[in-house]
Amino acid sequence: YIADMHFGHENVIRFDDRPFADTEQMDEALIQNWNERVTADDSVYVLGDAFWKNEENSIRIMQRLQGHKHLIQGNHDRVKGKLRPYWESIEQYAEVNDENRLVILSHYPILFYKNQHYGAVMLYGHVHNTREWELVEKWKKEQWAMGIPSRLINVGCMMAYMNYTPRTLDELLEANPQPMIKRIRKDGTNAGENSNGEL
């Protein structure tokens, strides 16, 4: 899983403070990282904003990327024309079974998602590592504090745990551990405490 690679997008280097001198260096690093992790038999879900405008350059890059490539369309993705056949699927939203775990895929964060209370994971992009991402994280913490599981994970390539590389679900969950749920009783005490107020 990965999002927001923005191949060929000069401005995103400054926007994300990416460690690349130019788009050529960024594109080559993204391709190398991808191919070091992805085999010809692997499936990779790109959660939007894969490329920036130049169709011919995008095709050249797609030809170099290993694996079965699936696009969850983002606001910058163009899915018509010559690039379309290089994607095995193109969806606005998807639900996949990853080793018997339900994973919800969208370019945009969905705060209330299917089977949230039953362990489903929601992967998203779009917000990069901006104030919007911080707001999603704040909301997640508030949900966990109320005993509501909220496993939203930003798979934008610029996130430290992504390091411009596609990641497995296990890697994402390890890098984004769930906090301990503290259920609050109607009387205001923590359900994890004993009568002495100790955990």
Roles of regions detected by a PLM:
Residues P85-R183, D187-G188:
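Conserved beta-sheet core of the metallophosphoesterase superfamily
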Residues W34-E36, R60-R64, E95-N97:
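Short, conserved, surface-exposed binding loops centered on an aromatic residue
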Residues F7, W52, D77, I110, ...:
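Short, glycine/acidic-enriched loop or turn micro-motifs at the edges of active sites
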Residues L47-L65, Q73, R78-Q92, K114-H117, ...:
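Metal-dependent catalytic neighborhoods of phosphoester/phosphodiester hydrolases
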Residues D41, Q66-H68, N100, Y118-G119:
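A general structural motif
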Residues I2-A3, V44-D49, K69-N75, L105-S106, ...:
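Active-site neighborhood of phospho(di)ester-bond hydrolases with catalytic His/Asp-centered motifs
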Residues Y1-S58, P149-R151, V155-A160, G192, ...:
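N-terminal active-site segment of His-dependent metallophosphoesterases
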Residues D22-R37, G67-R84, R151-P177:
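A short, conserved beta-to-alpha structural element at the edge of catalytic cores
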